[in-house]
């Protein structure tokens, strides 16, 4: 993606760019992809492993073993602050450090609604339909009935309701590509082209990242993959970088794409069942927001 493109060109620029890699051994859930194996090799060798992804790209490199130690960070940054070439500062940290609940359940505490800091319990409970839960139950049933059904996420398994136990239950039929929405859509298109039944779940706000693949890979080829668009609403995420209402103008203008908008659980499940069963179109479903 764009971050890799920037890293690739940084060495050629040769300027005093300091690139900080906060390595807490996790994405939102667990990490996926070949790069993370090399990060582990670097951690295990205290940064001395000869196989070094960053050096292979022409970047200088230093390693900080305890990135939660403020003094160690000060020393590392003091060492590199006036350097005259690009350098990577690889920092080994613990996600949720200092808060027991977050240390014990890193995935849940990546993002939380307001909670009691003493107990970790949410301050507000929602009685509305949980469409992530509904989705997971439906897809697990479908995957058991048909080995061609594959559930795909790009680093956000919780949006589909796939807890660690459910991911384990689904086995190879659940695929997490990491935070790589472009690849997720291209993968879904390829699976559909070869007779599979891919279902890719993604937050509305991340649709823009995959627009090229939606148009070029999926819809031009008219491959019958299913795209579940979550939190397409004005009241969901309200950060300016995570607004969730651009999916309709983005998706609805792509030829061959069928975009559905159910209003209740019954309509949603009927549309999801149909979209998996049919073989004529790529289908997106705007999942009702709770």
Enumerate the predicted regions with their spans:
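A short alpha/beta connector and helix-capping loop motif
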Residues: 2-21, 102, 197, 221-224
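Alpha-helical scaffold elements adjacent to nucleotide-binding pockets in ATP/GTP-utilizing enzyme cores
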Residues: 5-9, 34, 53, 75-79, ...
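Mobile "lid/hinge" segments at catalytic clefts and subdomain interfaces of large enzymes
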Residues: 11-45, 51-53, 221, 255
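Hydrophobic alpha-helical bundles that form the membrane domains of multi-pass transporters
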Residues: 19, 36, 47, 57-64, ...
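Short, glycine/polar-rich helix-capping loops at beta-to-alpha or helix-loop-helix junctions
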Residues: 5, 28, 46-51, 159-162, ...
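Catalytic alpha/beta core of large soluble enzyme barrels
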Residues: 288-290
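Thiamine diphosphate
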Residues: 59-76, 82-286
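Active-site flanking residues adjacent to catalytic metal/cofactor-binding acidic residues
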Residues: 1, 21-22, 89, 285
């Amino acid at each position: 993606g764009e971050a890799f493109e920037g890293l690739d060109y940084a060495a050629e620029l040769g300027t005093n760019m300091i690139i900080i890699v906060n390595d807490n051994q996790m994405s939102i859930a667990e990490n996926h992809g070949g790069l993370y194996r090399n990060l582990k090799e670097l951690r295990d060798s205290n940064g001395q492993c000869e196989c070094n992804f960053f050096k292979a790209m022409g970047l200088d490199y230093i390693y900080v073993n305890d990135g939660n130690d403020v003094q160690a960070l000060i020393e590392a940054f003091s060492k590199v602050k006036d350097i005259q070439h690009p350098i990577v500062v690889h920092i080994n940290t613990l996600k949720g450090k200092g808060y027991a609940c977050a240390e014990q359940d890193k995935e849940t505490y990546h993002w939380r609604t307001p909670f009691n800091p003493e107990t970790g319990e949410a301050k507000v409970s929602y009685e509305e339909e949980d469409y992530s839960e509904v989705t997971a139950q439906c897809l697990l049933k479908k995957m058991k009935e048909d080995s061609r059904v594959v559930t795909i996420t790009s680093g956000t398994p919780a949006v589909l309701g796939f807890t660690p136990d459910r991911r384990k239950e689904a086995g190879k039929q659940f695929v997490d590509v990491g935070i790589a929405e472009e690849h997720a859509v291209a993968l879904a298109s390829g699976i559909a082209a070869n007779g599979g039944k891919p279902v890719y779940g993604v937050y509305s706000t991340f649709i823009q990242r995959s627009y090229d693949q939606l148009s070029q890979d999926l819809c031009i080829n008219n491959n019958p993959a299913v795209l579940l668009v979550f939190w397409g609403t004005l009241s969901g995420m309200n950060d300016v970088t995570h607004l969730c209402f651009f999916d309709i103008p983005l998706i609805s203008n792509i030829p061959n794409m069928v975009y559905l908008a159910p209003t209740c659980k019954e309509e949603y499940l009927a549309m999801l069942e149909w979209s998996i069963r049919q073989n004529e179109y790529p289908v997106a479903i705007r999942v009702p927001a709770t």
